[in-house]
Each structure stands twice: as C-alpha cells, then as structure tokens.
Swiss-Prot record:
It comes from Bacillus cereus (strain ATCC 14579 / DSM 31 / CCUG 7414 / JCM 2152 / NBRC 15305 / NCIMB 9373 / NCTC 2599 / NRRL B-3711). Belongs to the acetylglutamate kinase family. ArgB subfamily. It is found in: Cytoplasm. Pathway: Amino-acid biosynthesis; L-arginine biosynthesis; N(2)-acetyl-L-ornithine from L-glutamate: step 2/4. This is Acetylglutamate kinase. Its main location: cytoplasm.
Length: 255
C-alpha cells in the first residue's frame, strides 16, 4: 500500500453520503493511503443567511471579505469537518479532521484583492498528511489555507488537486451524485482533455457536469495524473481498488 488517493467530497454531497460510500472508502483504504478533502458551500450559505450577510460569487469563487471569512472558517473547520469525521468513525474508519491552516498544511497565493480572502494552493506541507496516514488515520481536510498570518478560503476542488499533486497521488476522485459522463445514455469510462472539449462543444456534457469536468481539467494542469468522477451514492469501487465512473487523463501529446 504505497500509492496515495485523494477523495474530494463537495458540500452538496455531504448530506447524501450513505453506508455504501463509507464501505467504498474502506475498500480504497485496503489498497491505498487515503486523504479526504471536503467542501461546505450549502452550509456556509445557510449560516451567512442566518447572519444577514449577502452571498456573492464571481467566476465560481465566493467573494470573501473578513466577516464572510469568519463564517467560512467556523463552518468548514467546525461542524462540517467534524460531522464527516464522526461519520467515518461511526463506520470504523479512524479519521483526524484538520484544516489547511493547521501546521501550515495548505499555503496559498491570494487570487485578487477584489474577491477578498480567497486563495489558491501554492505549497502543501505533506509531512503532516504522511504522518497521520502512517499512524493509520484518514486525514479529513477543510479547505482553509494560510498566507503569512492570514487565513484564506480555498475552493475545495483546488485544495484537493493541490494535495493530490503534492503527494504524487495515483488518483483524485471527485464524489458526485451522477455515475460520470454519459454519452447517448452510456457511461464514458475513459476520456481526456481534447475529447472533453469536443463533448462540451457538441452538447454531450451540459449543465451541472460542466463544472465537474472543468475541475478535473484544472486538476490535470496542476499535475494530477488521473481523475475519476464517480457516483458517491452507489458502490464506486472494484475489489481491485479501481474506481467505477469516468476516468479523465491528459491524453497523448503529438507535439
């Protein structure tokens, strides 16, 4: 068991996770060293509404002034993270929840002043993750990062891709509520960058699948070798540890 695998679970999926999901994580842990990264968008939006703070986004990123950052940190590092940790442990999967600010795990580069405390991963302190895994814990990471003495919000896709690239992970798995990319009703088991562009142009990929594949493409650019888009409400792992869904790779360069 030498290869790492990073599992990214968006905030909209956290309340849909069932026993099947946790059994899949058990199967993955038998073959790989597992790291989980989670989001928390719906919970953050709800808490901001409770606090009478407007929810604003630009180009898919949450505009995060200081008062929003305080709420983001509270939700991601608090209730959301610990709920997932407790669900894992309920299924006999030992987990440790932490955020990217713990041990300077996720160091970031700010995106722009206009959107506030939002950053993209620039460095990952992998020794912390490896230490937890060597003690047989599953690290459960909230996507908060640091720059100097300031805490920043990180898009969970970017956080997961940064961690996967830094660990040299075998695979980054995006947990969704669909089986993968479908073409004429059939699952596309393997695809690459150029074919995805064609799928979008021809309308094979539409709606909510577009941001999922865009996240996969962005992960490839960050150095991740293989991304799988799977349905977290079903059994998405073979006994071999391979994922059932759509696998995205860079493809072959003819340059």
């Amino acid at each position: 068991m030498s290869d790492y695998i990073v599992v990214k679970c968006g905030g909209s999926m956290l309340n849909q996770l069932n026993d099947v999901f946790f059994e899949c994580i058990k199967k993955l842990q038998q073959k790989y060293k597992v790291v989980i990264v989670h989001g928390g968008g719906p919970e953050i939006d709800a808490k901001l509404k409770d606090c009478n703070i407007n929810v604003e986004k630009r180009d898919g990123l949450r505009i995060t002034p200081k008062e929003v950052m305080d709420v983001v940190q509270m939700v991601l590092c608090g209730s959301t993270n610990k709920k997932l940790v407790m669900n894992l442990q309920k299924h006999n999967l030992l987990a440790v929840g932490c955020s990217g600010c713990d041990g300077n795990l996720l160091q970031i580069q700010p995106v722009s002043e206009e959107i506030g405390y939002v950053g993209e991963v620039s460095y990952v302190e992998t020794a912390l993750l490896k230490g937890l895994i060597n003690m047989e814990y599953i690290p459960v990471i909230a996507p908060i990062g640091v720059n100097g003495n300031e805490i920043y919000n990180i898009n969970a896709d970017n956080a997961a891709a940064g961690i996967a690239a830094a660990l040299g992970a075998k695979e980054l798995v995006f947990i969704t509520d669909v089986d993968g990319i479908l073409h004429e009703g059939n699952l596309v088991k393997e695809t690459d960058e150029s074919e995805i562009a064609t799928f979008i142009e021809t309308g094979v990929i539409t709606g909510g699948m577009i941001p999922k594949v865009q996240a996969a493409l962005a992960s490839l650019k960050m150095g991740v070798q293989k991304i799988s888009i799977v349905n977290g409400t079903k059994d998405f792992t073979e006994v071999t540890g391979e994922c059932i869904g759509t696998t995205v790779t860079k493809g072959v360069s003819i340059a």
